[in-house]
Design a protein with these regions (language model features):
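Active-site hotspot residues in diverse enzymes, especially metal/ion-binding acidic/histidine motifs
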Residues: 1-230
């Protein structure tokens, strides 16, 4: 699925921020959201246990939690809501990830909501998409459309913030800067590289490690080693 995620991210960036496909840059995801016509709000708690990091509103109305309690009244279409607890219980990288996640929903998944509305479906989940940024524990054979949308947005978001084609240039540059040889003796230098990449791309260290692995670096004995492009 990595190629599919990368293709979706490339299409998104071609439309909203093509510079990220031309050279290594920090993707200004908040500015992109604004340019998409989205408003970001970060004042409201979206769930009791922070199992919802953010959501995007497709249709004006009240927003309810999983227990049907109203958590936001009169939310407006085109609003991205981020739970403020994400800042101090997670990382700034998680906030950026969540915003990218919501932007992708707006870009890619509005047709689903439009279809449900046209069909007259009583589809509460189609009015908003709540994002937990975690693995779906249900059997994928039992997933509904909304579960597939979440899975896709979770996969695409880190590719938007750290697109492969130009991120490889940055990684190569830092491998040289930190004199990394992948000989099992440079674990600390690799960690320094990951920290710099996380800061540069506005992602968490874990997300950066996953992206590095997806780009062809396999983790062996605590370090990353290039293995035949796999």
């Amino acid at each position: 699925f990595r190629d599919a995620f990368e293709n979706e991210a490339t299409e998104f960036l071609e439309k909203y921020y093509p510079l990220a496909l031309q050279e290594p840059v920090s993707v200004p995801i908040r500015r992109i959201a604004e340019n998409m016509g989205l408003s970001i709000m970060e004042e409201s708690l979206l769930s009791s246990e922070l199992d919802v990091f953010g959501l995007v509103v497709f249709e004006d109305g009240n927003i309810k939690d999983k227990n049907k309690n109203i958590v936001i009244r009169n939310a407006k279409r085109g609003t991205v809501l981020i739970d403020p607890r994400v800042y101090y219980e997670r990382t700034l990288g998680t906030v950026n990830f969540t915003i990218a996640h919501e932007c992708f929903h707006w870009h890619r998944h509005q047709p689903y909501h439009a279809l449900m509305k046209m069909l007259g479906a009583n589809d509460e989940l189609g009015k908003i998409i709540q994002c937990s940024i975690g693995s779906n524990s249900k059997d994928s054979e039992k997933w509904k459309a909304i579960d597939w949308m979440e899975w896709q947005a979770n996969g695409v978001a880190p590719h938007i913030l750290m697109p492969t084609s130009t991120a490889k240039i940055k990684v190569t540059e830092l491998i040289e800067k930190y004199q990394i040889h992948f000989d099992g003796m440079d674990g600390y230098r690799i960690e320094d590289m990951i920290l710099e990449l996380a800061d540069f791309y506005g992602l968490s260290k874990l997300a950066v490690k996953m992206r590095i692995r997806e780009m062809g670096y396999a983790k062996i004995d605590g370090v990353f080693t290039y293995v035949n492009g796999q």
